[in-house]
A protein has these predicted regions:
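Metal-dependent nuclease catalytic cores that hydrolyze phosphodiester bonds in DNA/RNA
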Residues: 1-158, 255-262
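Short helix-capping/linker segments at secondary-structure and domain boundaries
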Residues: 60-66, 202-205, 248
Length: 262
């Protein structure tokens, strides 16, 4: 009798589903998968923070205005003494840094996030470019941030897709290079994401709307090919097999290692 992965996941981690992120971890180090499922693996970077801002302005614009506090230099300067304001570089003074820390703390207490004026402006300028080229009203038109918890190949999968169109699914990505995004699909296993979404919603056409983060913010419409979907399916099955073995054998994850041929 085949082991019920959902039951084992619930028993070990207190949740019975997998996600794109957890499946991606399972393709690498099972110790990382174990940490991710326990909530111990936290990623934070300027790129991730900007991506969150960009997506919220794109798909949940009203919420973005509630969540973010745009930090301007003038707002910080207004809190400084005349002496600090008159210094050669006010931003290098302890008073300036203290005022900045206070503003961040105040935002945190209100459940808000501080964002620089430059990042806020850039995200909005990027979205303006999407509108100008027509992608915003076509391949980013539909229902936004659609959540799901469904069974796929006997496994419970959970996730959120960016945009559910009338006959397509699209996912927004900001990137350094729109042309080189094809390599990111492989390296970050975005193909697994595409496979899960298309299967769960029964929609064949999946697109990435990619946009460069440097001016003039070149956008690209990248269609997911059948070959890429097939690769995503193979990765999905491989990850599930690794997770099944890990849960069945109940081994110490740090004893895990990769084995492959090139």
């Amino acid at each position: 009798m085949k082991m019920n992965i959902s039951d084992k996941l619930q028993e070990r981690y207190g949740k019975s589903h997998l996600s794109y992120s957890s499946l991606k971890q399972a393709l690498g180090d099972m110790a990382q998968f174990d940490r991710y499922m326990k909530g111990e693996l936290k990623y934070q970077s300027d790129a991730l923070d900007f991506g969150t801002l960009y997506d919220m302005l794109l798909f949940e614009r009203e919420q973005a205005f509630e969540k973010y506090v745009v930090l301007s230099d003038s707002a910080i300067m207004s809190r400084l003494s005349d002496k600090a304001k008159a210094s050669k570089k006010p931003s290098m003074t302890l008073e300036y840094k203290s005022a900045l820390a206070s503003m961040k703390e105040e935002a945190l207490e209100e459940g808000k996030t501080i964002v620089s004026h430059d990042d806020w402006q850039m995200a909005n300028d990027m979205i303006d470019r999407l509108a100008t080229c027509g992608l915003l009203d076509t391949y980013l038109a539909g229902d936004y941030q659609v959540g799901f918890l469904e069974e796929l190949n006997g496994i419970q999968v959970k996730g959120f897709l960016d945009c559910l169109g009338s006959n397509f699914i699209s996912d927004s990505k900001s990137a350094r290079s729109a042309e080189k995004f094809r390599y990111a699909v492989r390296d970050f296993s975005y193909d697994i994401q595409a496979y899960i979404y298309t299967k769960v919603f029964g929609i064949k056409d999946f697109y990435w709307v990619v946009q460069e983060k440097t001016y003039p913010y070149l956008p690209a419409l990248v269609k997911c090919s059948e070959q890429t979907l097939f690769t995503g399916e193979m990765k999905f099955n491989d990850a599930v097999s690794r997770i099944r073995k890990f849960l069945t054998d109940d081994y110490e994850p740090t004893t895990d290692y990769l084995e492959y041929e090139v």
